[in-house]
Amino acid sequence: MYIESVQLKNFRNYDSLELDLAQGTNIFYGNNAQGKTNILEALYLCGTTKSHKGSRDKDMIQFGKDESHIRMMVKRDELSYRIDMHLKKNKAKGVAINGLPIRKASELFGVVNLVFFSPEDLNIIKNGPGERRRFLDLELCQLDKIYLTDLASYNHIVNQRNKLLKDLSVQPSLKDTLDIWDIQMAEYGRKIIDKRSEFIKELNETVRKIHGNLTGGLEELNVIYEPDCTAEKLESTICANRERDMRMRLTSAGPHRDDLCVMANGIDIRTYGSQGQQRTAALSLKLSEIYIVKRKIKDTPVLLLDDVLSELDSSRQNYLLDSISDIQTLITCTGLDDFISHQFQINKVFQVVQGTVSQPV
């Protein structure tokens, strides 16, 4: 699998952009705030319908314009796919595959798999539980079409339940309708908890090997899934918390409050680990994501690497670059020295200056 080309129109700081990409490594270099990350964001958005930064659609449309367009040409199993995405202010985004509009993000499943790796990902260990849930969900949504649909349904139900909890203060008669949302929330929540639990077991098999290699065998990494409540007790917990939820006007229990605990040699490194340990563990998790996707789809995902090398020491740079040698990779950076010193093969180089992309001679 690889991306053949990308076109942008009125996206972020790009008036218009057309790029043909190499199947191997594509480097985008330039000073900060020139638009390098915007290219990766556009590709990830087009392939998943989500911004890796959680940006709103209207914020990605170029200032002063009413709409934006992204086109991505993908080659997979000798088949070609054209993915078009239209963003319009105050309207839902439109996505089409080979000219046919799709209604759900899950219809992109099986067309392109993207792994985004940014400096923020290196803080996944020390940041709050929301970041670790996001890591889980981004991975599972690319691997399991049913999970993607179930998660969307669950989030919708929680949002509707929270809205109802707020409305109860002025319309107490609506209380009986909570039963409907509670039953549906428990149904979809159990599915999510079970899928997350299964995935963590598979993740541990991979992450232990990678982390062992990264640390020279000095550390054994273990990821522990910490559900807010078990699948078996979810419905009863929701029921038991109802009065509390009505006072707080929000849903206090469920998989939207799950967390992960990352242990190195039996020690919780979020609390007791050094920054170096936390970053190495985060790198192990992201590399595991790549290997699991490869194994599941029996193909290589496309890696979007946003200025991560500058955050790693030389040995971890080497390990990362060796790990991605057979994957189409788009890398942003401020210079080429790291790649030259590691004698890393580069297939195409692009210079980015204030929203203009060129290939140096």
Task: Give each language-model segment a name.
Residues M1-N31, P172-V302, E311, S315, ...:
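Conserved NTPase motor "head" modules and their coupling/switch loops across ABC/AAA+ ATPases, GTPases
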Residues G47-I125, P129-E131, L140-L143, Y147, ...:
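Nucleotide-state sensing region of NTPase/ATPase domains
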Residues M72, Q328-G335:
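Structural recognition of the conserved hydrophobic beta-strand(s) that form the central parallel beta-sheet
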Residues G35-K36:
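Conserved lysine of the Walker
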Residues Y44:
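Helix-to-loop junction immediately C-terminal to a conserved catalytic motif
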Residues S106-L114, S118-I183, Q359-P360:
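A conserved P-loop NTPase coupling/switch region
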Residues D306-V308:
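Walker B catalytic acidic pair
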